[in-house]
């Protein structure tokens, strides 16, 4: 999960010691080194690849290679709304850390005309990813994303393909919100960066939304527009595509794995199994799914949704996966406003079991969190997940998630 920006509506900036000229001067020497290394990499690549290899950057017919990992729901954060996570893979050794100045230098090589002058928000760092903001000499605000593992690098590249395609939809005026635009990337032996435009706005305060035509309706509209996107946005970007039955079977597999841990209340296992075996619940038309909706990925300004980011887990699947976050986070009195705006944005209407599946996804995300703890041997995560599962079991008791249909009998002739 990316960290929420710590800035207000206007982008914050941080001058390094010496101010603008200092950063520009220091970046210059790093740029020369980055250009030299990039040149070496290009020469090596030209020797290794056929000279007639086509470039995909500007080819409209280019179809990105299918990305096997990460699948939707592979996040190592507390679960929100994504599909089941795959088995944990052995951890990679992160690449060496690069300073903000080095990243700025590489960005100036990756994007022609990008001459950074000062640092800006966001500034976040994890063992797998480093993100910095910079302002260039033209006043443009950029984000530099450094991937420190191959898995994160693959995720960045896959997300870039999705962003390029959604960006075209935005430019055609068919979306009411913006997305980050990928301006360039640079891959070297010990570094992999991607440069994106910075999208303005603050994380949506979903827990304090109010009913009515403001942000609640704006959130519903944005979700509906996401689910109306052409599925080719995902399939041509090489991201996963699941039909309704595949979605159901993936959740069933997660249920089996959860039961095998012996840490889940039996009443919950029965509740989930009943819902997953109810075939009527799983008759839906797959849509584009964002896959990682959270406050920090939905940005607002002026009382409306202005941008959506964090598309690395996008896929085609069950729209209930996105709505699970809404139903578990938004105030109850806002749900009608969100749903009404969502319904209006959907051209073919909404299937009648969408809300029930969203509730199921929300509950199963706790099971996914438990499995993450078990697979990584993280006892605090296991204990946290077990506690949440026990709380949920106490809340729902023996009630089924979906009430079985009661057959209607004809009146007995009197």
Language-model segments: what does each one mean?
Residues 120-234:
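ATP-binding pocket architecture of kinase catalytic cores
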Residues 2-5, 70-73, 77-118:
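Juxta-kinase regulatory segment immediately upstream of eukaryotic protein kinase catalytic domains
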Residues 320-350, 360-378:
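Active-site activation/catalytic loop segments of kinase-like enzymes and analogous catalytic loops
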Residues 126-136, 143-144, 276-321:
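Active-site acidic catalytic loop and adjacent metal/ATP-binding pocket
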Residues 3-5, 70, 368-414:
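ATP/Mg2+ or Mg2+-diphosphate-binding catalytic cores
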Residues 3, 21, 25-61:
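Intrinsically disordered, low-complexity, charge-rich segments with an acidic bias
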Residues 188, 193-209, 228, 252-260, ...:
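A glycine-centered beta->alpha junction motif in the catalytic cores
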Residues 99-114, 231-290:
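An alpha-helical support segment within catalytic cores of ATP-dependent transferases
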């Amino acid at each position: 999960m990316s960290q929420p920006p710590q800035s207000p509506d206007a982008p914050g900036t941080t001058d390094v010691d010496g101010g603008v000229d200092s950063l520009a001067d220091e970046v210059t020497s790093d740029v020369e080194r980055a250009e030299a290394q990039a040149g070496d990499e290009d020469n090596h690549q030209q020797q290794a690849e056929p000279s007639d290899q086509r470039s995909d950057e500007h080819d409209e017919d280019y179809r990105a290679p299918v990305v096997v990992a990460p699948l939707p729901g592979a996040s190592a954060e507390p679960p929100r709304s994504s599909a089941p996570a795959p088995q944990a893979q052995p951890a990679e050794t992160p690449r060496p850390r690069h300073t903000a100045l080095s990243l700025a230098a590489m960005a100036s090589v990756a994007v022609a005309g990008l001459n950074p002058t000062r640092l800006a928000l966001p500034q976040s760092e994890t063992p797998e990813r480093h993100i910095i903001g910079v302002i260039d000499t033209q006043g443009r605000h950029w984000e530099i994303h450094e991937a420190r593992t191959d898995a994160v690098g693959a995720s960045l590249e896959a997300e870039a393909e999705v962003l390029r395609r959604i960006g075209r939809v935005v430019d055609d005026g068919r979306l009411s919100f913006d997305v980050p635009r990928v301006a360039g990337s640079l891959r070297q032996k010990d570094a992999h960066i991607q440069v994106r435009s910075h999208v303005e706005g603050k994380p949506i305060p979903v827990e304090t939304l109010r009913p009515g035509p403001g942000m609640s309706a704006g959130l519903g509209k944005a979700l509906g527009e996401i689910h109306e996107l052409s599925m080719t946005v995902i399939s041509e970007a090489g991201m996963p595509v699941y039909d309704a039955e595949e979605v159901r079977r993936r959740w069933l597999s997660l249920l089996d794995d959860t039961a095998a841990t012996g840490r889940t209340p039996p009443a919950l296992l029965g509740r989930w199994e009943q819902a997953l075996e109810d075939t009527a619940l799983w008759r839906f038309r797959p849509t584009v799914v964002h896959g990682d909706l959270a406050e920090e990925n939905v940005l607002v300004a002026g009382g409306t949704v202005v941008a959506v980011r964090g598309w690395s887990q996008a896929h085609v699947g069950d729209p209930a996966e996105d709505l699970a976050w809404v139903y578990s986070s938004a105030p109850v009195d806002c749900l009608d406003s969100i749903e009404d705006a969502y319904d209006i944005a959907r051209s073919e209407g909404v299937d009648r079991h969408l809300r029930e599946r969203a509730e199921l996804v929300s509950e199963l995300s706790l099971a996914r969190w438990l499995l993450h703890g078990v697979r990584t041997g993280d006892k605090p995560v296991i204990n946290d997940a077990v506690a949440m599962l026990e709380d949920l079991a106490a809340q729902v008791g023996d009630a089924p998630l979906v009430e079985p249909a009661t057959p209607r009998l004809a009146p007995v002739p009197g």
